[in-house]
Amino acid sequence: MKHKKYKTILADPCWEQKMAGKYATRHKRIRELPYPTMNVEQIKNLPIKDLAEEGCHLWLWTTNQFLKEAFEVMETWGFKYLTTITWVKPSGCGNWFVSRTQHCLFGYKDKCQFKKARYKPTVFFANIPKRHSEKPMEFYDLIESISDENRLELFARQKREGWDVWGNEVNSDIKLNSEEVKQEAMQSEARHSSQA
């Protein structure tokens, strides 16, 4: 399968987190997340670097708990950090602090290019969607107002027009076999080198 390159990649990794402390001891609470998770090394090892065009925008969701690791993932995938967009929720949960925010790190590959609207706010307020871990639809509008096609959503929950998707809850448009993607990227680089 030939992989295309993307100008926009949105990722909402299924960070490996479990309920802990007092929260886990409450009998009526779920102790495990209602979906499969990946550890940080598994997320880092996804071949995202090979799917990104020069100037590609990366929008990487993270929780407060995994903020440090999200920066590591961004760097491993070959992106440079530019800013953080914070989603302020109307309610939250937590043991010691009530966490009402989630963050999306924005980065770019090689050079930062904006061909569309700029000067967007880095904080937004939106209601919490009905499904666990789902992000607000307004965020897609924000991305589409800034970042170009081709667009790819990783760990997608549903298909959105104008986007390719990959995830265990959707019919994926791409395969993310690390070796397959890396081999194809090497062949593509070899072709470009021989033409130069």
Report residues per predicted region:
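Class I S-adenosyl-L-methionine-dependent methyltransferase catalytic core
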Residues: 1-196
